[in-house]
Amino acid sequence: MKKKYICSLLFFATICCFSISCDHGIEPKPILKSPPGFSGTIRFVSEWPDSVKRSFIVVFKNPLFTPADFTIENLKFLSREILLGVQMHDFSSLDSAYIPATPGPFPSGSYAYVAVVQQSTENLSLARKDWFVSGVYYANGDTTKPGTMVIPDSTFVKNINITVDFSNPPPQPPGGN
């Protein structure tokens, strides 16, 4: 009788342990409504210079205070080329880009410098001296300093809008011509 009681108690204890330790089993990760990233519109409000050979959207993680800040490690997004001569261009980090090389979710975090840049070189160059900033993202209309783009976890941020006025370009980061 005692043996039967101990076996029953042991069986009950084992069932309780399994019941308590099992939550939902192997559960899939929640499906994101939209992959994290950013989008916006660029408005070109003046005539395109003939010297422009290509135009891009760039995103830097850290501010560009010195020429040494302009590095490939700091450059987190380099769009494909914007068609020359357009008056408006819609963009998204989910579109194909040179950096990152494969489209997909863009990492959450703060990004200190989002801009439209032009080059006059025949070939794509990653040298700072070959880039001319023609438009900068400003947060909340504050045009005194570049705006920080903040992408919260699992969030797609819209309205990262930039106005490009070739007649009145923004201050250039250090290291340019």
Model segments located where?
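Bacterial Sec-dependent N-terminal signal peptides
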Residues: 2-5, 16-45, 166, 170-177
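Hydrophobic helical h-region of N-terminal Sec-dependent signal peptides
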Residues: 10-15
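Surface-exposed coil/turn segments at beta-strand junctions on protein surfaces, enriched
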Residues: 33, 84, 106-108, 152-155
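Short, ordered, surface-exposed loop/turn motifs in non-cytosolic proteins
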Residues: 47-77
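Tryptophan-paired
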Residues: 65-109
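A short, solvent-exposed beta-strand micro-motif common in secreted/extracellular proteins
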Residues: 102-126
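Structured interaction patches on ligand/partner-binding surfaces of diverse proteins
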Residues: 120-168
